[in-house]
Amino acid sequence: MAVSLGDDDADELPSMLWGLDPVFSSYCRLYITDILLMKESRQVPGIYFYKTHPIFQVDVLGIVVYKREREDFYCYGVDDSTGVINCLCWKDEKWRDQGGSTTCGDASGFPRSFNIEDELKGLKEAERKSTVLEIGDLLRVRGTVKTSRDNREIKATSFYKVHDPAMAVQISRMLELPQLYRKCYDQPFKMPSDDLGSTEAGGSSHPQYLLSRAVLTLKEFLLEKEVTRFRPYDVEFLLHPLIQRSSAEQEADQPGTSFATQVGKLLKETLSFLQDEGQIFRKKRTQDEVYNVTEQDKDLHIAIKDVLREDTKREKYAEKGCHVLHILSSVRQRYSQNLSREVLEVALTFLESNSDIISTTEAHYIVL
């Protein structure tokens, strides 16, 4: 069956179901214009939707139309004839400190007899050149989609220059993409009915679906109202319509539990789910159940930036920056012992999207 989520959410599945879509775990070969126009998820920052498919990593092929070099990375503008997107490509550490290119042969220009050292140098030089591109070169990039300062870009996990003198690779790509769109990306996501519960007798009252809707409702409320902290009774009313709808569908089949009990149970599960995701956290474990919203907690953001600013001055962290576990330990000492790694990673992602910090590797960060 095709998933139906109502008029307001027809374009976005609950996050708990994303893993069932094979597109989610693949590098999607989309046109750049579609990557630029994809809507960001309201549930999880850094996830985007092309129609009903959740996407966070892509595979693009195009011509380099501009190039900017920094100490640790290159910024390439890649054009596939539908649009241009900025690709952030980190330099390989083994090439950073290498000066000029490696040459083989003697001073007269004639090649010498076979020499294993010269051959290895030649292979290394060829490998180095494949990671340094100029305007007009054909570049293939795989990476994650990011939004920085309201501009969409790709943070490369792998990239290389494509040697395509006969344009065979580009022609193959031009023929492949329309078929991928027609057979996969433009098709609505479908899954077996038993994954959502009964198709007609209460699919929207299925516990997993109900929890997904509650999580989405609470996330949208916290984002729209820019809530910094709250107590459970402050947001309980948001779940009333969900329970009322669910109770009406189940009324004919079974008596069910009381309304207040259902609301309390769903609220507890929703808050637990958001805590596991790192979206909310409790700064102090007290009887007064107060939750802080990670993306709105300015004090947490300041603590993270202070740790990075102070520790990256030390020689040990000057080049790569601070590792996530080091940041977590330091922030726990100065802000809250209850901080989890999931909360820290959500905060780091938020700060990076606002260009307050930058990741130098998968798990190292520096402050700008």
From Swiss-Prot:
Cell compartments where the protein resides: Nucleus; Chromosome, Telomere
Region feature (Winged helix-turn-helix (wHTH) 2): 296-368
Family the UniProt entry places it in: Belongs to the CTC1 family.
Keywords: Chromosome, DNA-binding, Nucleus, Telomere
One Pfam family from the record: Stn1
GO process annotations (BP): telomere capping; telomere maintenance; telomere maintenance via telomere lengthening; vasculature development
Domain of life: Eukaryota
GO CC, alphabetical: chromosome, telomeric region; CST complex; nucleus
Region: Interaction with CTC1, residue numbers: 2-192
Tagged with keyword Zinc: no
Transferase is among the record's keywords: no
Record region (Winged helix-turn-helix (wHTH) 1): 201-295
DNA-binding region: 58-162
PANTHER family per the UniProt record, alphabetical: CST COMPLEX SUBUNIT STN1 (PTHR13989:SF33), REPLICATION PROTEIN A-RELATED (PTHR13989)
Gene Ontology molecular functions: single-stranded telomeric DNA binding; telomeric DNA binding
Known function: Component of the CST complex proposed to act as a specialized replication factor promoting DNA replication under conditions of replication stress or natural replication barriers such as the telomere duplex. The CST complex binds single-stranded DNA with high affinity in a sequence-independent manner, while isolated subunits bind DNA with low affinity by themselves. Initially the CST complex has been proposed to protect telomeres from DNA degradation. However, the CST complex has been shown to be involved in several aspects of telomere replication.
Gene coding for it: stn1
Name of the molecule in the record: CST complex subunit STN1
Consequence of gene disruption: Morpholino knockdown in embryos results in decreased red blood cells and an arrest in T-cell progenitors, as well as increased vascularity. The vascular defects could be rescued by wild-type gene and by thalidomide treatment.
Subunit structure: Component of the CST complex.
